[in-house]
Amino acid sequence: MFIISGRTMLKKAQQEGYAVPAFNIHNLETLQVVVETAAELRSPLIVAGTPGTFSYAGVGNIVAIAAELAKSWNHPLAVHLDHHEKLADIKMKVAAGVRSVMIDGSHFPFADNIALVKSVVDYCHRYDVSVEAELGRLGGQEDDLIVDGKDALYTHPEQAREFVEKTGIDSLAIAIGTAHGLYTAEPKLDFERLTEIRQRVDVPLVLHGASGLPTRDITRAISLGICKVNVATELKIAFSDALKNYLTQHAEASDPRHYMIPAKAAMKEVVRKVIADCGCEGKL
């Protein structure tokens, strides 16, 4: 089996003090880059897609390509549903072979968030599918979801304890000052809050919105309990900037087998850096 649950790899990361990178992908080329690079560095890997990505590329296509790449590189990985909100959608994708899920009910009141997440956990655990949920809200934009900065909410440590106990989730995404998208100024992460959450919660903790974070912040967050680091925007920008630059310099280019090469190379450098920041090279 090359498509696996995220549960075991996150528990190992928690025990050994590193983080597993979750890279958001969009198509064949971005999948190739993250699997190839992780395999070369023997890094654990989570390949993530938002609802928009699965709608664009097709869940069956993503699972099949990921499985074939994992097999060819002899590199097990998790295909992960990022920021999914509907149980019916999750059921369909689990049936298609996904084994790692994030249910996002963070926009609901606390009790409603618990009820939604528990329904997903009850279903997914029957099929050995790991479940991540979010408590608190990150600002910024993910797919079509836009959260204004004033609506972003930090995770409350005591609520985190209750949330984990009542839902039975496998990992918890927390809000400590990161945001989706690129930062216009260097964020100030609430490491004290992270420490307080870690003291109350025994499941692996997840950091969303890591694109553009300084290495020192990522490594400190990992030292305080973060076990999974999500990166999306930074990958897209590296890929698209290199592609645009190549096509600007080679106006006659028409073969995607050629003009995708520099785009993939630029994205690969970001993947290598994130793996280094996570301290997970050789940890497969």
From Swiss-Prot:
It is an enzyme of class 4 (lyase). The keyword Transcription regulation does not apply. It holds the Pfam family F_bP_aldolase. One of its GO terms (biological process) is galactitol catabolic process. Zn(2+) binds at H83, H180, H208. SUPFAM superfamilies: Aldolase (SSF51569). Its cofactor is Zn(2+). It comes from the Bacteria. One of its GO terms (molecular function) is zinc ion binding. Binds 1 zinc ion per subunit. It catalyses: D-tagatofuranose 1,6-bisphosphate = D-glyceraldehyde 3-phosphate + dihydroxyacetone phosphate. Dihydroxyacetone phosphate binds at G181, G209, A210, S211, N230, V231, A232, T233. InterPro entries: Aldolase_TIM (IPR013785), Class_II_FBP_aldolase (IPR050246), FBA_II (IPR000771), TagBP_ald_KbaY/GatY (IPR011288), TagBP_aldolase_GatY (IPR023955). The active site is at D82 (proton donor). The keyword Metal-binding applies. Belongs to the class II fructose-bisphosphate aldolase family. TagBP aldolase GatY subfamily. Catalytic subunit of the tagatose-1,6-bisphosphate aldolase GatYZ, which catalyzes the reversible aldol condensation of dihydroxyacetone phosphate (DHAP or glycerone-phosphate) with glyceraldehyde 3-phosphate (G3P) to produce tagatose 1,6-bisphosphate (TBP). Requires GatZ subunit for full activity and stability. Is involved in the catabolism of galactitol. This is D-tagatose-1,6-bisphosphate aldolase subunit GatY. It comes from Salmonella schwarzengrund (strain CVM19633). The gene is gatY.
